Each structure stands twice: as structure tokens, then as C-alpha cells.
């Protein structure tokens, strides 16, 4: 089981209580990575934010909980100036504690695109490539979390899959804030087209 918290100090204690009381093995941690979020929401410098996030991650690892770091607003972030260095530190901690750390790429504003020649931070494939090749994040530890503000949640999620992300976050019928998230039913058919099989999934239940 898993749950999700912010990286605020008060939530750290809440997480410890939940882990103790519910026996949770994984927790999601919101780690805003764009300057917009770091400066205006967190009211920190990049250095302060990174040190703060890493301290929360380490606290999770100390009690044997696997962190899932939600890189909020990644399509407006400095990928090679902040995101990659941060993820390198995450991988060092993962190796030190021998506990997997997952990385969730959150296209919070729906700005991501999958066009050939698109540059980071807008390029979905560029983000996934950077995390895998330059930060050393294993494919099985990478997720894509898309928003559909510009109606690219499905194509961006599929692109993330194709370039190495092992997971895609979905919601039934795409229900979510603003214009929604990646629809689960759409990704079922994307999966079937890519793999050539539904692997036992029954698509008719969507009408129930």
C-alpha cells in the first residue's frame, strides 16, 4: 500500500504515524522541481529545496519506507540544472539504503509535447532520456503523470512508455482537476496496440 504527502515538516510526522499504524511500505512525496514552484510556492532557493527534499527522503529510508518522488511541474523545470542533479542524489540514497526510489514525472500544467525536435523541458522523450541516461534512474523506477490541459495526455503518456517509463498514471474516464488526467481506458487500448494483446483485460466492463 502507498499514500501521498507533501514535503512539509508537519506531513513528515503524519507519515511516520501512518507508517506505524497502517504498515505502509511506500509513500509518495511531492518534490516541486520548477523555479515557479520552488521560489513562489515553497519560498526557497534551489539549494534549500533540494536539501529539504533529500532530508525527507532520507527520513523515509531510515524507517524502511520506499519513497516515490513526485517531480511536480517538470515541464517547466531546469532539467539539467536541477532535476538531473536532484535525481542523481536520489539514486545515491537508493544505493546507500538498498531501497528503491521511484520518480514520477508530473506534467502539472499539461505543457509536455512529444514532437520530434522539441526541446526540454517540454519534450517528454527528452525528460525520460535525461532521467535514464544522465541521472541513472532505472526504467522500472520511472512513471509519467500527465494532465490533459492541451489534450496531449494520451500521446504524451504513450511516448513516455516508448522511451522508457515503465508506468503511466491514469484515472477512469480521465476524471481529474481542470481538463483531467490520462484516461485509463485510452491507455488500455494504447497498451493493446503496442503489445499486440490485451493480456486478459476485459474492455467490455467500461459500459457497466
Model-derived segments and spans:
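Catalytic-site beta-strand/loop segments enriched in glycine and acidic/polar residues
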Residues: 132-152
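Phosphate/diphosphate-binding loops
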Residues: 197-208
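C-terminal helical cap(s) of enzyme catalytic domains, especially alpha/beta-barrels
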Residues: 176-197
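Small-aliphatic-rich amphipathic alpha-helix that forms the alpha element of a beta-alpha
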Residues: 145-171
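Structural motif
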Residues: 70-72, 106, 145-147, 171, ...
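Single conserved hydrophobic/aromatic residue that forms the stacking wall/gate
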Residues: 2-9, 13
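Alpha/beta enzyme core
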Residues: 14-29, 33-68, 72-137, 163
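Glycine-rich phosphate-binding active-site loops on the catalytic face of alpha/beta enzymes
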Residues: 31, 163-180
Amino acid at each position: 500500500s502507498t499514500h501521498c504527502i507533501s514535503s512539509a515538516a508537519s506531513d513528515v510526522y503524519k507519515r511516520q504515524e501512518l507508517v506505524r499504524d497502517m504498515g505502509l511500505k511506500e509513500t509518495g512525496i511531492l518534490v516541486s522541481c520548477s523555479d515557479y514552484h520552488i521560489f513562489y510556492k515553497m519560498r526557497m532557493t534551489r539549494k534549500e529545496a533540494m536539501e529539504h527534499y533529500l532530508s525527507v527522503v532520507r527520513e523515509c529510508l531510515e524507517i524502511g519506507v520506499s519513497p516515490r518522488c513526485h517531480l511536480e511541474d517538470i515541464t517547466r523545470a531546469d532539467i539539467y540544472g536541477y532535476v538531473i542533479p536532484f535525481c542523481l542524489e536520489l539514486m545515491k540514497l537508493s544505493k546507500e539504503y538498498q531501497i528503491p526510489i521511484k520518480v514520477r514525472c508530473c506534467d502539472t500544467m499539461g505543457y509536455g509535447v512529444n514532437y520530434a525536435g522539441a526541446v526540454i523541458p517540454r519534450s517528454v522523450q527528452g525528460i525520460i532520456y535525461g532521467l535514464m541516461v544522465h541521472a541513472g534512474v532505472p526504467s522500472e523506477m520511472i512513471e509519467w503523470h500527465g494532465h490533459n490541459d492541451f489534450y496531449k495526455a494520451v500521446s504524451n503518456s504513450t511516448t513516455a512508455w516508448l522511451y522508457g517509463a515503465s508506468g503511466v498514471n491514469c484515472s477512469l474516464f480521465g476524471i481529474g482537476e481542470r481538463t483531467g488526467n490520462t484516461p485509463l481506458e485510452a491507455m488500455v487500448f494504447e497498451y493493446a496496440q503496442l503489445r499486440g494483446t490485451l493480456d486478459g483485460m476485459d474492455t467490455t466492463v467500461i459500459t457497466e
